[in-house]
Amino acid sequence: MPSVRIKEREPFDVALRRFKRSCEKAGIVSELRRREYFEKPTWARKRKKTAAVKRAHKSNIIVKR
């Protein structure tokens, strides 16, 4: 869990912005969005397979140049 120490005389908005940024870097927001709805195991496998195919195509394109 990201934590932010509030500096002396620091406005709340600035501290909140730093906290949000640290949460983004930790991947909390994307993890929440991913877990928002139940994903069937078949859908998860299909999503992972298509991502692997995209990565393979992308790496082939970069290598061919």
UniProtKB/Swiss-Prot annotation:
InterPro entries: Ribosomal_bS21, Ribosomal_bS21_CS, Ribosomal_bS21_sf. One of its GO terms (cellular component) is ribosome. GO terms for molecular function: structural constituent of ribosome. One of its GO terms (biological process) is translation. The gene is rpsU2. Coiled coil: none annotated. This is Small ribosomal subunit protein bS21B. PANTHER family: MITOCHONDRIAL 28S RIBOSOMAL PROTEIN S21, SMALL RIBOSOMAL SUBUNIT PROTEIN BS21. The keyword Repressor does not apply. Belongs to the bacterial ribosomal protein bS21 family. Keywords: Ribonucleoprotein, Ribosomal protein. It comes from the Bacteria.
